[in-house]
Amino acid sequence: MNCAISGEVPEEPVVSKKSGLLYEKRLIQTHISDYGKCPVTGEPHTLDDIVPIKTGKIVKPKPLHTASIPGLLGTFQTEWDSLMLSNFALEQQLHTARQELSHALYQHDAACRVIARLKKERDESRQLLAEAERQLPAAPEVATSNAALSNGKRGIDDGEQGPNAKKMRLGISAEVITELTDCNAALSQQRKKRQIPKTLASVDALEKFTQLSSHPLHKTNKPGIFSMDILHSKDVIATGGIDTTAVLFDRPSGQILSTLTGHSKKVTSIKFVGDTDLVLTASSDKTVRIWGCSEDGNYTSRHTLKDHSAEVRAVTVHATNKYFVSASLDSTWCFYDLSSGLCLAQVTDASENDVNYTAAAFHPDGLILGTGTAQSIVKIWDVKSQANVAKFGGHNGEITSISFSENGYFLATAALDGVRLWDLRKLKNFRTFDFPDANSVEFDHSGSYLGIAASDIRVFQAASVKAEWNPIKTLPDLSGTGKATSVKFGLDSKYIAVGSMDRNLRIFGLPDDDNTEDSAQDS
């Protein structure tokens, strides 16, 4: 007989009058004192309802399972198993607690790093703002009721007041204008003394150009090289792709130096900043990015500029390498300070509000800016006053590219109907090349050759206004897409780089044997 509460053989057995159940006396007394009812049936009980059962006092009863060695061993085994299971559960809980503590410590460390970085960026921004305020000249009175000022800068509409209003621009200060003017004077003097380099590739050499190499730089799911630039001092080629990335390619070694990721849409324009390690990119995501080379050789985005409200089509660097311009489909072009990334002026044409800028380039001397529009118009701007000083009409279709010659008075423009050459001295068109869907036009650095990218690549020998511009070479579009998007001349026109609507960068030049012979003749 076992106790109904403990399950053990009772030492002082008692039985309930009402339920007839057997209990250990001390246990049932305690339960009735606390609860006043039977622990099994729940009936009301008092101490008078339990009756002791008398047993022999000489021999005390023993539990059956402890009455033998096997029973004792079984009891010990059960207790050992329970102890091991409890120990295992504790170890699991300890391991989980350690993992949670480690994760919490990592999160705390990361949060401290983010806070430190944000504080550093905040302090740098405050310092730049303080420097800009110190350099800010006395602001002239602005008629806030006008949407555009007479000098071409954007005014402030009534609906732009308040916290969501557009940023007030610092303006191009007198110090900046002096710097641009001094640069113009110096470059103009240098141009008068400049000679065509003896190392320039000859016409005969260009006639022998053939494809030397092809390099797959961009992704296959979104192929297409939309823009390109060359850093002649290091022979590095930069390409902007439809796959949202820009690639820096070392031509001599045939290796990719860095892939610039950060834009969310295609890269529409890319430019090196002089001989520095800075790169500018414009994108259909409405932003311009300034990239710099870090100590490990990788490029990171130093500034992301969000001053435009529509696709940015072009960036062009001023000859000082301190300023640049971006042109957008939002009917404005912006003049930036390169070091701070600040937009000094955002300019629109007061006479034409619905104009979408699709191309832009600085004149080699830096005081003139050329812009192309989706409305087939080429506009010439005075950078100092931001005034539109000339317009060239005649194209049919969007202006896709513009290029100034280093001689200072020729301008080439490409559009969907072909390429036109303009004399800046007389502001007249003096020659037209009928190449449908011309995507890019480019003078070489000496002003001796003109490259045109359309369904193929054409190279012309530059001449005077009256003389004929003779074709030198036609390079086929080997991409199979029938659309060459960009063309650039290498140093001394020793090679031509071509981008197309596939993902490959193609290099055209002299075969090794002919190149060696041509170099010997030059020397």
UniProtKB/Swiss-Prot annotation:
Q: Does the keyword Nucleus apply?
A: yes
Question: What are the protein's GO molecular function terms?
Answer: ubiquitin protein ligase activity
Segments for region (Disordered): 136-165
- What UniProt keywords are attached to this protein's entry? DNA damage, DNA repair, Immunity, Innate immunity, mRNA processing, mRNA splicing, Nucleus, Plant defense, Repeat, Spliceosome, Transferase, Ubl conjugation pathway, WD repeat
Q: Write down the SMART domains for this protein, in alphabetical order.
A: Ubox (SM00504), WD40 (SM00320)
Task: Tell me the route in metabolism or biology where this protein functions.
Answer: Protein modification; protein ubiquitination
- Record EC number: 2.3.2.-
One Pfam match:
WD40_Prp19
Subcellular location per the Swiss-Prot or TrEMBL entry: Nucleus
Q: Which residues form the U-box domain?
A: 1-70
Its primary localisation, in coarse terms, equals nucleus
Q: Which GO terms describe its biological process?
A: defense response to bacterium; DNA repair; innate immune response; mRNA splicing, via spliceosome; protein K63-linked ubiquitination
Q: Where are the WD repeats?
A: 220-261, 262-301, 307-346, 352-391, 394-432, 434-470, 479-518
Entries under InterPro entries matching the protein: Pre-mRNA_splic_Prp19_cc, Prp19, RING-Ubox_PRP19, Ubox_domain, WD40/YVTN_repeat-like_dom_sf, WD40_repeat_dom_sf, WD40_rpt, Znf_RING/FYVE/PHD
Q: Which GO terms describe its cellular component?
A: extracellular region; nucleolus; nucleus; Prp19 complex; spliceosomal complex
Provide the function of this protein.
Probable ubiquitin-protein ligase which is mainly involved pre-mRNA splicing and DNA repair. Component of the MAC complex that probably regulates defense responses through transcriptional control and thereby is essential for plant innate immunity.
Assembly notes: Homotetramer. Component of the multiprotein assembly MOS4-associated complex (MAC) at least composed of MOS4, CDC5, PRL1 and PRP19 which is related to the PRP19C/Prp19 complex/NTC/Nineteen complex identified in other organisms. Associated with the spliceosome.
What family does the entry list?
Belongs to the WD repeat PRP19 family.
Protein name according to UniProt: Pre-mRNA-processing factor 19 homolog 1
Organism expressing this protein natively: Arabidopsis thaliana (Mouse-ear cress)
